A protein has these predicted regions:
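Sec-dependent N-terminal signal peptides
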Residues: 4-13
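Formylglycine-dependent sulfatase
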Residues: 2-4, 21-481, 489-510, 514-520, ...
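Bacterial Sec-dependent signal peptides at the C-terminal "C-region" and cleavage site
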Residues: 12-24
């Protein structure tokens, strides 16, 4: 009898353990990488050294045709984390004067991390998850169950100036700041210093994230940890050992460094590499020299490899804590970046290099070793993580779950991926302050919406008037663009005026009206 009771006790314990294991919610490690284009080995860039992200990709799903909603930091992140498109959330620019624009525009919206918090998760963030200009001092305090970690403004081996560690650069910028605090001196666009990884912000933050993972692994609740790396955003600064991974003379330059033939003037307003040209030693107009192009590409690649090493620290922390098999890892870039393509060095374009982003999801028991060319958007991440974690999806979400694609990579969920990019007519809009917008005033702009189908890209430009409280789009079409990636993968020529593409153009316009029904009827 005693033996029977013992066996029954063991059986009950085993069943209880199995039940709790089945019911356990997966953790989420949410890794945002600022300005990362799909320049990774797992995306076919064989010359890039990204072994750790590539290894993670082999165990997860790589979405090779993923697109951001806006090719600009702040609006892209608000769109993804709110689950609402820019036309639904009203955020199109990096804000300048208006603070906490997320809750100003969307006071009641439940963000992605907030939804997980509301469902019993410990939610924590460090680094650049939201763009800091769009949220409160707590990085949207209601989204996190623990305070936002923002102590990495200065790296451990010294404060640096805006992240620089070169002593001469630091001294020069410090002196200039003393003389003219309101107008700080520009630093160089790139830096290679022989310092440890933790000397720069992202390396310091990664080490804090490792400690956070190990502490969270001991908690009874599941966690949602968001880590936002700042590189490869300008300036391209990384420890020298990552620069040395590359032979600068052998680095590939952009194959086509001009605007597409026949592209409308609206498409050529923003791409003047304005962000880059604000740095010291960069000419204010005209073509970037080949020598500087190679330095910049070397710097961008070094930053990618640097971040790759930091991602590895986080993944190893999951493994060492024994929670890797019950943790979903999501790696994404907020927008694309031109490394000389179309003669542009920066973001904020409706072209492929401006809108296409990396998206990799490794999840337990689904999507291992999957690659999919199905069209996806960053809007899809919110519902996807809900599905993978077994949570209900908020009714306001505009994206679609990618879980079906992870199970069957040929599954199609979108007819087209939608992105949009606005340009500002500086003559119509004098409310430009330091290259940024005074969004308290009316901004006269042009908005370009783009549809990316498996073969084509259609862009439609219209006049827009944007304020902090409303956005009005005109009916008049200012310009259209059409690109065929089967015959012209580099977007060399706008085909919208070609007779042989008249039928395709008509089909794309019809699809545009179908997918963007909130816009006023066009007048051509």
């Amino acid at each position: 009898m005693k033996r029977i009771c013992t066996l029954l006790s063991v059986f009950v314990v085993l069943c209880t353990h199995r039940s709790s294991a089945v019911e356990a919610k997966p953790n989420i490690l949410f890794i945002a990488i600022d300005d990362l284009k799909p320049l990774l080995g797992c995306y076919g860039a064989s010359w890039i050294k990204s072994p750790n992200i590539d290894r993670l990709a082999e165990r997860g799903t790589v979405f090779t045709a993923s697109y951001c909603q806006v090719p600009l930091c702040a609006p892209s992140r608000i769109s993804m984390l709110s689950g609402l498109s820019p036309d639904a959330n009203g955020v199109y620019f990096n804000p300048f004067k208006v603070k906490n624009v997320l809750r100003r525009h969307l006071p009641e919206v439940v963000t992605l991390p907030q939804h997980f918090k509301n469902n019993g998760y410990i939610t924590r963030a460090m680094g650049k998850v939201f763009d800091g200009r769009t949220v409160d001092a707590g990085h949207d305090s209601v989204s996190w169950s623990r305070p936002f970690v923002n102590q990495h403004r200065f790296a451990p081996c010294g404060p640096g100036v805006r992240g620089y560690q070169n002593p001469e650069t630091k001294d020069r910028l410090n002196e200039a700041a003393k003389e003219s605090p309101a107008k700080p001196l520009a630093g160089p666009p790139a830096e290679s210093c022989d310092v440890p990884d933790g000397a720069y912000l992202d390396g310091a933050m990664a080490r804090t994230a490792v400690a956070e993972i190990k502490e969270l692994a001991q908690q009874p609740q599941p966690f949602f940890l968001a880590v936002g790396f700042h590189k490869p955003h300008l300036p391209f600064i990384a420890p020298k050992k990552y620069w040395d991974l590359y032979d600068r003379a052998a680095l590939p330059l952009a194959a086509f460094q001009a605007f597409p033939f026949g592209s409308p003037p609206e498409a050529q307003v923003v791409p003047n590499s304005g962000e880059l040209r604000d740095y010291a030693g960069v000419i204010k107009s005209g073509s970037i020299s080949e020598a500087q192009q190679r330095e910049l590409i070397n710097g961008y690649a070094a930053c990618v490899s640097y971040i790759d090493a930091q991602v590895d620290l986080l993944v190893k922390a999951l493994e060492e804590s024994g929670i890797a098999e019950n943790t979903i890892v999501c790696i994404w870039g907020d927008n694309g970046w031109h490394l000389g393509e179309h003669g542009h060095w920066g973001k904020s374009t409706d072209y492929e290099d401006g809108t296409r982003v990396p998206l990799i999801i490794r999840a337990p028991n689904v999507g291992k070793g999957v690659r999919s060319s199905s069209l996806t958007e960053l809007l899809d991440v919110y519902p996807t993580l809900c599905d993978l974690a077994g949570l209900s999806k908020p009714a306001h979400l505009q994206g679609k779950s990618l879980a079906p694609i992870m199970r069957n990579p040929t599954t199609q969920i979108h007819e087209a991926a939608i992105s949009q990019c606005s340009t500002v007519d500086s003559q119509m809009s004098p409310q430009l302050v330091g290259g940024q917008l005074d969004e308290l005033a009316t901004i006269h702009s042009q908005m370009g919406w783009t549809l990316r189908t498996p073969r084509y890209r259609y862009v439609e430009w219209r006049e827009a008037k944007l304020t902090d409280k409303e956005h009005v789009f005109g009916t008049k079409v200012l310009g259209v663009e059409l690109y065929d990636y089967q015959t012209d993968p580099l977007e060399r020529e706008n085909l919208a005026g070609k007779t042989e593409y008249a039928t395709v153009l008509k089909e794309q316009k019809a699809l545009f009206e179908k997918m963007l029904p909130h816009l006023p009827k066009r007048v051509e």
